[in-house]
Each structure stands twice: as C-alpha cells, then as structure tokens.
Amino acid sequence: MDIFEKCYAPSLAKELKEAGVYPYFHALQSRQDVEVQMEGKRRIMLGSNNYLGLTIAPDVVEAGIHALERYGTGCSGSRFLNGTLEMHLELEAELGKFLRKPGIVTFGTGYQSNVGIISALVDRHDYVICDRENHASIYAGCQMSYGKMLRYRHSDMEELEKCLQRVPEKNGALIVTDGVFSMGGDIARLPEICALAKKYGARVMVDDAHGLGVLGQGGRGTASYFGLEDQVDIYMGTFSKSLASLGGYMAASEEVADFVRHASRPFIFSASIPPANCATALAALRHLEQHPELPERLRELSLYARKGMTDRGMKIRESALTAPTPIIPIYTYETYHTLEVAREIYDRGVYVNPTLPPATPEGEVLLRTSYMATHTEALLDEAMDIMADVLVKDHE
C-alpha cells in the first residue's frame, strides 16, 4: 500500500473547497489590528488572539527592530548550547517577577511548551488528569509522556474526583487544565480543582495561554483572578496572544524549572526564540505592566459584546455567557450551515472563526469570536449588526 494513498482520498477539506465555503488560510495584506486588509478588502477582525492590541504598539514594534539590528534574525542553536541570549535571561527574570514564580523556562511556541513540560514531568509511574476541553497541545504532551492519562467531563468536579480516586497512593498525579478555555471562553473551576488536588496529593498545572493579560491583578492570569497563585504549581503560557509575539513559557519553582530544562526534549533539541520575538515579548510584558488599565478595558468590551449579541438574538454558549473573557462562542449547530454563514459574514466585512470538531466537542459547532482592548464600541456595533443580519434575520 502507498503511504500517500490517504492524501488522494476524498476529504472534508476538498468538499468544502468545491462548495466554496472553505474557511481557512485567508491571506492578510496588513498588520494584525482591529481592522485588517484581507484578500483585498477591509474587514473587522473578530478572530484574533491579539487581546491587548500590542502587535502594533510602537514601543513593541521598535523593540523588535532594535533586536534585529543588534542580534540578527536568529540564534542558530538550542538554549542548551549557543542559543541563549542575555535577552532570554532578561525575559525570564522579568516574567518570573510578574508572575511571582521564580523558575521560568521559555520555549519556541506555546504548543511546544505544553508538550515539553508534560513529557518531562510525567513518567510511566505517573498519572496526568485532563479536562476534556483542554487544548490539543496538552493532549500531545500526554501522548508523548509515558504516563497514564485520565480525562474528566468539562468542568465536572465530581468526575475529576473519581479520576483522582483511581490514582494509587504510590503514584504521582498532575491535574492539567486550561485556565480560560480557548474555544468556549469559560474559566476553569480552579478553586475546586486546587482543593481536590490538595485532598488527594496531586499537583496542578494551568495552561494560561488565554488568561495572561486578560484575567487577574494587572493581567497576571487565572490563578491571580481567583487568588490562588500559591496553590497552582505550574503556569504555562504563550507570547503569541496578549504579549504580541511568538513563543511560550513555563513558570514554577526553581527546582521544577531546572528539572524541565535538563529533561525536556522539545526544549533541549529546538532552536531558541529568535531575537525579535524575544524582544517584542519583553516589550509587551513591560507595556502591560505600565498599562494595567488594558485588561480592564478588554473586560469592558467583552461584556459589551456579550450583551450586544444577546440583545440582537444571537445564541452564546451558556458556559461563556457571564465569563469576563474576550472569547465569545456563538452556537450555529450544523457544519455546513456554520461554514455558509461564516462565509457570508466574511463577505460582508467581518472576520470570525468557524470552529468544528475536533477543536470543539463532537456535535458542537460554533463561530468563535474574540476581542481586543483596542476595539471600539462603534466598531463592535458595526460587526454585531452584520452578524445578526446573517445569523438571525436571514436564517430565521
């Protein structure tokens, strides 16, 4: 059998392209902003993870330019060898102070961070326990580890406790959860998770990719939002969302961080974050520290959008109705209908993300919308009017 045979077989992607509703790989001709030029037309951007709008902040852009001029385009090596810049150490030190965790390890991407952390810490004697709606990179890390994975229904604390009860006393256990769930926009039930972890002697890791810059004191994230910074053992996060760059990190105790530095194959055998990305992440972090009003503005706009959508008759996923996060999923139920309305909304000048399984639970299809602190109410009204026109009036 030819290993490429699967490549020539019929697929959903081919069907969608033939039907004219294929929703992926639209090309931008502009910066990532609240309005973009995409395929030659102005479109309101409601699909970006640029939550604080810092990809175009002058101080962040200038930091990237300066790093390119000083260090060149890349580090040409692993952090383990020739790929560590002073700037990497500076970023890790400043991030550690901001997150109040002394041990920071930076990775090339957020995906790589989850894979690298979990595969280093979880061995064949350990259990890793996951919310079913965790990000795909968490599951990739679990698969790369030699541990036993248990999953519990989304935010179901009774089922989490049953999973913990299955772990023998002689084995270690790591509970891993998104802080803010990337598709649903809801927040993990962290107080209950931490209480159960304490009861059963487990450790807690929070993927805060969508929580940093969004929740908590000064944007410190989900644990800060709940006042549980001392009870979460590991934070994982990215530089590609609120911090307007590329890369990821782990924040933990210095002992745990040092172990991961020396045991994580994705960290050891990958090139380090390029100079421009390192510099822009550091500049964005400093910008956030200097402008603590940005997360609050983001929350205001997110609540404004939730109310505006509900008032216009759009059906928001129940778990996200009151969450103070910039991710708002709209139910659309059926795959082809979702792709058709997403295309119509796009043609009318608004970019949103149609979200299908496996990114969502089986049987659940959504339009994922997301917001920036630099949006305006007027721009959101324009976008919501267009979406309501398509989703409510045209499809009643």
Residue ranges of predicted features:
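Active-site phosphate-binding strand-loop segment of PLP-dependent enzymes
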Residues: 150, 154-206
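N-terminal "arm"/small-domain region of PLP-dependent enzymes with the aminotransferase-like
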Residues: 5-73, 202
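Conserved PLP-binding catalytic core of the aspartate aminotransferase-like
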Residues: 296-303, 310-349, 359, 364, ...
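Active-site PLP attachment segment
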Residues: 224-259
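PLP-dependent enzyme catalytic core of the Aspartate aminotransferase-like
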Residues: 3, 58, 62-66, 70, ...
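Conserved PLP-anchoring active-site segment centered on the Schiff-base-forming lysine
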Residues: 117-136
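Structural motif of enzymes handling amino- and sulfur-group chemistry
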Residues: 272-291, 297, 310
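Conserved N-terminal alpha-helix of the aminotransferase class I/II PLP-enzyme fold
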Residues: 62, 66-110
